[in-house]
A protein has these predicted regions:
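Conserved N-terminal phosphate-binding loop of PLP-dependent enzymes in the Aspartate aminotransferase
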Residues: 1-151
Protein backbone atom coordinates (compact mmCIF):
# COMPACT_ATOMS: atom_id res chain seq x y z
CA UNK A 1 0.00 0.00 0.00
CA UNK A 2 2.81 2.43 0.88
CA UNK A 3 4.58 1.75 -2.40
CA UNK A 4 1.40 2.47 -4.33
CA UNK A 5 0.80 5.72 -2.46
CA UNK A 6 4.42 6.76 -2.97
CA UNK A 7 4.10 6.06 -6.70
CA UNK A 8 0.92 8.14 -6.92
CA UNK A 9 2.69 10.93 -5.04
CA UNK A 10 5.56 10.98 -7.56
CA UNK A 11 3.15 10.88 -10.51
CA UNK A 12 1.27 13.85 -9.10
CA UNK A 13 4.27 15.86 -7.89
CA UNK A 14 6.13 15.56 -11.19
CA UNK A 15 2.94 15.99 -13.27
CA UNK A 16 3.83 12.88 -15.28
CA UNK A 17 0.28 12.39 -16.57
CA UNK A 18 -0.06 15.82 -18.22
CA UNK A 19 3.56 15.57 -19.40
CA UNK A 20 2.79 12.21 -21.08
CA UNK A 21 -0.22 13.72 -22.87
CA UNK A 22 1.82 16.66 -24.17
CA UNK A 23 4.90 14.65 -25.17
CA UNK A 24 2.74 11.93 -26.73
CA UNK A 25 1.03 14.41 -29.04
CA UNK A 26 4.39 15.87 -30.07
CA UNK A 27 5.82 12.37 -30.55
CA UNK A 28 2.97 11.24 -32.80
CA UNK A 29 3.16 14.47 -34.78
CA UNK A 30 6.85 13.87 -35.46
CA UNK A 31 6.16 10.23 -36.34
CA UNK A 32 3.41 11.23 -38.79
CA UNK A 33 5.68 13.77 -40.45
CA UNK A 34 8.66 11.40 -40.67
CA UNK A 35 6.62 8.43 -41.95
CA UNK A 36 4.26 10.28 -44.32
CA UNK A 37 6.34 9.55 -47.46
CA UNK A 38 6.08 5.78 -47.03
CA UNK A 39 3.13 3.90 -48.51
CA UNK A 40 3.48 1.00 -46.08
CA UNK A 41 2.51 3.24 -43.14
CA UNK A 42 -1.26 3.37 -42.76
CA UNK A 43 -1.69 5.32 -39.52
CA UNK A 44 0.02 6.64 -36.39
CA UNK A 45 -2.23 6.71 -33.32
CA UNK A 46 -2.15 6.62 -29.55
CA UNK A 47 -2.91 8.26 -26.24
CA UNK A 48 -0.37 9.75 -23.90
CA UNK A 49 2.99 8.17 -24.57
CA UNK A 50 1.53 4.85 -25.75
CA UNK A 51 1.61 4.98 -29.54
CA UNK A 52 1.06 2.60 -32.42
CA UNK A 53 2.26 2.65 -36.00
CA UNK A 54 -0.02 0.64 -38.26
CA UNK A 55 1.43 -0.74 -41.46
CA UNK A 56 -0.46 -1.81 -44.56
CA UNK A 57 0.14 -4.02 -47.57
CA UNK A 58 2.49 -2.23 -50.00
CA UNK A 59 1.02 -0.94 -53.26
CA UNK A 60 4.18 -1.43 -55.32
CA UNK A 61 3.89 -4.78 -57.05
CA UNK A 62 7.46 -5.83 -56.26
CA UNK A 63 7.06 -5.08 -52.55
CA UNK A 64 3.56 -6.54 -52.39
CA UNK A 65 4.78 -9.89 -53.73
CA UNK A 66 7.50 -10.01 -51.06
CA UNK A 67 5.05 -8.96 -48.37
CA UNK A 68 2.59 -11.69 -49.41
CA UNK A 69 5.39 -14.26 -49.16
CA UNK A 70 6.00 -13.10 -45.58
CA UNK A 71 2.32 -13.22 -44.76
CA UNK A 72 2.07 -16.82 -45.95
CA UNK A 73 4.87 -17.87 -43.59
CA UNK A 74 3.13 -16.14 -40.67
CA UNK A 75 0.88 -13.05 -40.44
CA UNK A 76 3.26 -11.51 -37.87
CA UNK A 77 6.41 -11.96 -39.95
CA UNK A 78 6.60 -8.42 -41.37
CA UNK A 79 6.07 -6.80 -37.97
CA UNK A 80 8.63 -9.08 -36.35
CA UNK A 81 11.25 -8.09 -38.91
CA UNK A 82 10.60 -4.42 -38.12
CA UNK A 83 10.98 -5.23 -34.39
CA UNK A 84 14.17 -7.20 -35.08
CA UNK A 85 15.76 -4.39 -37.08
CA UNK A 86 14.81 -1.76 -34.50
CA UNK A 87 16.50 -3.81 -31.80
CA UNK A 88 19.51 -5.05 -33.75
CA UNK A 89 20.40 -1.84 -35.57
CA UNK A 90 19.03 0.88 -33.31
CA UNK A 91 19.10 -0.77 -29.84
CA UNK A 92 15.42 0.08 -29.40
CA UNK A 93 13.11 -2.53 -27.93
CA UNK A 94 9.56 -2.49 -29.23
CA UNK A 95 6.92 -5.05 -30.13
CA UNK A 96 3.96 -5.72 -32.37
CA UNK A 97 0.40 -5.85 -31.03
CA UNK A 98 -0.97 -9.27 -30.21
CA UNK A 99 -4.37 -8.57 -31.74
CA UNK A 100 -3.08 -6.83 -34.89
CA UNK A 101 0.30 -7.95 -36.19
CA UNK A 102 0.47 -4.89 -38.45
CA UNK A 103 0.75 -2.46 -35.52
CA UNK A 104 4.11 -1.64 -33.97
CA UNK A 105 3.84 -0.43 -30.38
CA UNK A 106 5.96 2.37 -28.96
CA UNK A 107 5.60 2.56 -25.19
CA UNK A 108 8.35 4.74 -23.73
CA UNK A 109 8.53 5.32 -19.97
CA UNK A 110 6.88 8.38 -18.46
CA UNK A 111 10.33 9.88 -17.78
CA UNK A 112 11.50 9.69 -21.42
CA UNK A 113 13.23 12.78 -22.80
CA UNK A 114 12.35 14.62 -26.00
CA UNK A 115 15.78 13.70 -27.36
CA UNK A 116 15.07 10.00 -26.79
CA UNK A 117 11.72 10.31 -28.58
CA UNK A 118 13.48 12.04 -31.48
CA UNK A 119 15.97 9.14 -31.61
CA UNK A 120 13.04 6.72 -31.91
CA UNK A 121 11.48 8.77 -34.72
CA UNK A 122 14.74 8.76 -36.69
CA UNK A 123 15.29 5.06 -36.06
CA UNK A 124 11.82 3.97 -37.20
CA UNK A 125 12.03 6.30 -40.20
CA UNK A 126 15.27 4.60 -41.24
CA UNK A 127 13.86 1.09 -40.85
CA UNK A 128 10.63 1.96 -42.69
CA UNK A 129 12.60 3.65 -45.47
CA UNK A 130 14.65 0.48 -45.85
CA UNK A 131 11.48 -1.63 -46.03
CA UNK A 132 9.92 0.76 -48.55
CA UNK A 133 12.90 1.15 -50.86
CA UNK A 134 15.41 -1.65 -50.42
CA UNK A 135 15.37 -5.23 -51.55
CA UNK A 136 17.99 -5.90 -48.85
CA UNK A 137 15.35 -5.57 -46.12
CA UNK A 138 13.14 -8.14 -47.81
CA UNK A 139 15.80 -10.64 -48.89
CA UNK A 140 17.35 -10.76 -45.44
CA UNK A 141 13.90 -11.18 -43.93
CA UNK A 142 12.97 -13.91 -46.41
CA UNK A 143 16.06 -15.79 -45.26
CA UNK A 144 14.75 -15.52 -41.72
CA UNK A 145 11.34 -16.73 -42.88
CA UNK A 146 12.88 -19.76 -44.58
CA UNK A 147 14.72 -20.67 -41.38
CA UNK A 148 11.48 -20.26 -39.41
CA UNK A 149 9.65 -22.64 -41.74
CA UNK A 150 12.39 -25.26 -41.38
CA UNK A 151 12.19 -25.29 -37.58
Amino acid sequence: MRAGLATLDVLERKALGPRALQLGEQFRGKLRQALAPFEIVKEVRGLGLLSGIEFTVPKKLSLRALYEAFHRVHPAMFGQVIVMRMFREENILTQICGNNFMVLKAAPPLVVTEAQLDEFVEAIRGVVELADTSVTFWTEALGLAKRAVNI
